Amino acid sequence: MVAANDPGLKETLGEVTRWFFDDYFNRWVSVANRTREEGPEFILDYWGCPLHVCSPTTNRWLIKPEEVTEWLAGMQARLREAGYTHTAVPDSRVTVFHPGGVAIEAIWSRRAGETEVERLALHFQVVRNQDSWRVVAIQFTDTSAKSLDELWPVHRGQHRGHTP
């Protein structure tokens, strides 16, 4: 989603979408399923530090790089124990706020072969830094939803504030 008729924001949309899905997502999956031999430190190329993570059961800041990599290592170990092979993305959306800030939302169906082992809806707050893009906050929840609109519909506010 970008502002109408703004070619700069359309360029940002293409750039960040390629970075997230072609680079970050593919690398994350290949490290998690061990088709790429790397430790969890790779994530510091994509996730900022500090990183805020929030779900129905956690709400915390990961301040140090080792906290970020430990959090990822724990998640990936749990997935590997379940036989993780890949992640399907049944729905996603990218909202460009300005050339330096976007939100990326997705439903991730984490799988062991054809069996779903985990289904999450995720919201990534992503900002541009001097080198590339960085995720600075992640919110997530378990879901059975098939679409983001089903799970997180847009609500238009009806505010009673002062009107000019």
Task: List each model region and its residues.
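Short, cysteine-centered beta-strand-loop-beta hairpins and adjacent loop/turn segments enriched
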Residues: 81, 110-118
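Hydrophobic/aromatic beta-strand elements that line small-molecule binding cavities or substrate pockets
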Residues: 89-95, 107-110, 121-127
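Beta-strand residues in well-ordered beta-sheet regions across diverse protein folds
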Residues: 54, 104-105, 136
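Short beta-strand edge/turn micro-motifs at domain boundaries
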Residues: 118-156
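Short beta-strand segments enriched in hydrophobic/aromatic residues
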Residues: 47-48, 108-110, 139-141
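A solvent-exposed, acidic/Ser-Thr-rich amphipathic alpha-helical stretch
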Residues: 38-100
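Short, low-complexity N-terminal intrinsically disordered segments enriched in polar/charged residues
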Residues: 1-46, 155-164
